[in-house]
């Protein structure tokens, strides 16, 4: 059996490794257009490579995918983070789990993961061709036992193959190859980005973070999205897990409104505005001589507390005894419904992800085989699947790659 893999990223390599593992007699050729295989693996997670996420319940895991959660349920019952960890550890790559659930190699170096995949492919006799761009894939009408695909490379070389795995990531060229074989491409838009916000309340406070904040994003058509999680002030606006989750779930909505929207921030979602107001009244009665700016009444960073006090018009030297009810109401409003104008998207350097790709309706997720062109398989980001940040995008690449490889090897 001759198997071609187009794309030398996480999904392509893992698909090739899986096919070779399940059928040692198969001839497997991996074509990578550049001279840098596994480039995203190398640069992700700030160069540490966030291999997967510490979530071993397939149903819970699937909830980390704005696009693909339904389709990935079955595959995750067959190959999930536990299997990813077991595979890497068997290859000698030890992994560790961080507090937020992200899993990294103990070396904290993505090169450990890159080398592991390159060595595994080599040991299994996968032929890796670098600088080999697949120009076209022709599906032949297969005679008995005849190869059913002809792959033409950019240099004009043509080769016959029985099965083809498309794992070209978010590359438009890969989408064109899929389209030429009859597939529908869901238009791509960015996912996982930070929010650009220019606001006096944030100026000079980059690096300050808040735990367990509730964010509500509203566009001009009154579409609303909510997320909870940690929030981080940056030099250009807002970031952190809560913002990144909003950007993923709202990828299409935000693209349609030109990344202009209103963000309401509730820093204390566990308390009602009424309760906070009563607490301020009590505090005022007991601490009349204290300066308002001196220390926060609630668990928010001191510098931010002072900033919002200034924002609502409370003078630097003002003491609690002189604070009006209106000023206290304004403080509560800032803590529970601070409104910010999102004016654009920033770059999240840890992960680069798009939403969009090959329509999931056209793929059989039991095998990752095309429902349109038999013998054609898909894995990774070429599909209209994307996850939130934290190792989810690599996990879908490992899972779909592994299943595609197994299916290509065992298909009669």
Predicted regions, residues:
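Residue-level recognition of phosphate/Mg2+-coordinating polar/acidic sites
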Residues: 21, 36, 57-59, 77, ...
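A conserved FAD-binding loop/helix module that cradles the flavin
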Residues: 163, 167-181, 385-412
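Glycine-rich FAD pyrophosphate-binding loop
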Residues: 4, 20-46
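Short beta-strand to alpha-helix junction loop
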Residues: 72-82, 99-119, 129, 167-169, ...
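A conserved short coil-to-beta-strand element within the FAD-binding core of flavoproteins
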Residues: 130-147
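Short hydrophobic core segments
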Residues: 4-6, 31, 134, 158-171, ...
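Beta1/beta-strand and adjacent pyrophosphate-binding region of the FAD-binding site
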Residues: 1-11
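N-terminal glycine-rich dinucleotide-binding loop that anchors FAD/FMN and/or NAD(P) in oxidoreductases
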Residues: 39-72
